[in-house]
Amino acid sequence: MVLGWLPLLVMVLAPGTTGVKDCVFCELTDSTSCPGTSMRCGDDEDCFTGHGVAPGVGPIINKGCVHATSCGHEEPINYMGVTYSLTTNCCTGHMCNGAPDPTRGRLAGAAASLALGVLLLLQHVL
């Protein structure tokens, strides 16, 4: 009986498996922070963070969705009159290009511990 709960538990604890992917979006900026907003990506798109560099000036970044075929590419881009070399670094997963959330790992661990405790309790009751 306990094994019947396992698939349900996996579905509840596995976020981002619905096929819908949101990514963080922010315009090109020379700021070190890019909190951005959420945007919905297409089926053939991945989240990305673009890092741009140019001699004698600070770096630029942008974030959003991009076709998977554009991942890892480097291209020239003009920002504030300066030509930067912008590299697109992609990731897969819901909001994976956002800033790391230090509480996310602790919350997932607490949820997994609680679920395991419930399963063990059910095993002894049944």
UniProtKB/Swiss-Prot annotation:
SUPFAM superfamilies: Snake toxin-like (SSF57302). It is a lipid-anchor; GPI-anchor. Its main location: membrane. Keywords: Cell adhesion, Cell membrane, Cytoplasmic vesicle, Disulfide bond, Fertilization, Glycoprotein, GPI-anchor, Lipoprotein, Membrane, Signal. Sperm surface membrane protein that is essential for effective sperm-zona pellucida binding and penetration during fertilization. Gene3D superfamilies: CD59. Belongs to the SPACA4/bouncer family. A lipid is attached at N97 (GPI-anchor amidated asparagine). Residues 23-97 form the UPAR/Ly6 domain. One of its GO terms (biological process) is cell adhesion. It is found in: Cell membrane; Cytoplasmic vesicle, Secretory vesicle, Acrosome; Cytoplasmic vesicle, Secretory vesicle, Acrosome inner membrane; Cytoplasmic vesicle, Secretory vesicle, Acrosome outer membrane. Disulfide bonds join C23-C47, C26-C34, C41-C65, C71-C90, C91-C96. This is Sperm acrosome membrane-associated protein 4. Residues 98-126 form a propeptide. Pfam families: UPAR_LY6 (PF00021). One of its GO terms (cellular component) is membrane. The gene is SPACA4. The keyword Transcription regulation does not apply.
